[in-house]
Regions:
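Short catalytic/ligand-binding loop motif for oxyanion handling, primarily in non-cytosolic enzymes
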Residues: 9-11, 33-37, 122-125, 143-147
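Short His-centered aromatic/hydrophobic patch
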Residues: 117-120
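N-terminal low-complexity, Ser/Thr- and acidic-residue-enriched intrinsically disordered segments
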Residues: 1-44
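A conserved catalytic-core segment of Leloir-type glycosyltransferases
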Residues: 30-98
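Conserved acidic residues
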Residues: 24, 112-113
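Membrane-proximal helix-turn-helix segments that form the acceptor-binding/catalytic region
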Residues: 100-111, 122-131, 143, 159-176
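Acceptor-binding helix/loop patch of EC 2.4 sugar-transfer enzymes
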Residues: 40-42, 70-91, 131-172
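Short catalytic-loop micro-motif centered on adjacent basic/acidic residues
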Residues: 1-2, 113-115
């Protein structure tokens, strides 16, 4: 089982696992193959720019549609926020927490291994381990990177301003 937000590695991990006969299911957010993302990606004016252009490019070649389990919750939240019909979009960390909770709540459908990105949170990893599912975590940047950057900023003042948003750094710590 693979769980990831967006087209990380251009969907290479689920594609390779499927090719090798090892992909049980692929859990992701909105994309151009299923759900709300599929319909929005068909609208010519929306496909032309920004986030909708990125959404229209999220096509999972080599992964059968029957194995793709998606959620439109992240996209819906952003759209409602942009229309002032819900809380505004603040940052990607909220997406990570929401996706993490959704995957943890879904369960693991008999999977023996969960491959997930480090940044998506710990609820799904803890739930998988509690269910006896082996976890493989893709760490594409050290979880403490922001601390290292802040230390470098303090060491070499004047080159780049320090992060004034301590709450954001605390959120980074919380999710890692």
């Amino acid at each position: 089982m693979v769980a990831q937000i967006g087209a990380r590695h251009h969907y290479a991990i689920p594609r390779m696992l499927e090719k090798g006969g090892h992909l049980q299911s692929f859990h992701t957010d909105s994309n151009a193959v299923k759900g709300l993302g599929k319909w929005l990606a068909m609208v010519p004016g929306l496909r032309a720019s920004g986030s909708f252009k990125n959404l229209a490019q999220r096509k999972m070649v080599g992964v059968p549609g029957s194995k793709i389990k998606h959620t439109d919750a992240l996209l819906r939240r952003r759209i409602l926020g942009a229309l002032h019909l819900g809380p505004g979009y603040e940052n990607y960390i909220q997406d990570d927490h929401l996706f993490d909770a959704i995957i943890a709540a879904r369960g693991f459908e008999g999977a023996d291994t969960l491959y997930a990105m480090q940044k998506h949170g710990t609820k799904m990893l803890e739930a998988a381990q509690a269910a006896g599912v082996r976890t493989v975590v893709d760490v594409f940047i050290t979880p403490m990177c922001h601390h290292i950057v802040e230390e470098e900023r303090a060491r070499y003042p004047g080159i780049e301003a320090s992060c004034e948003d301590q709450a954001r750094l605390e959120l980074e710590d919380e999710r890692t």
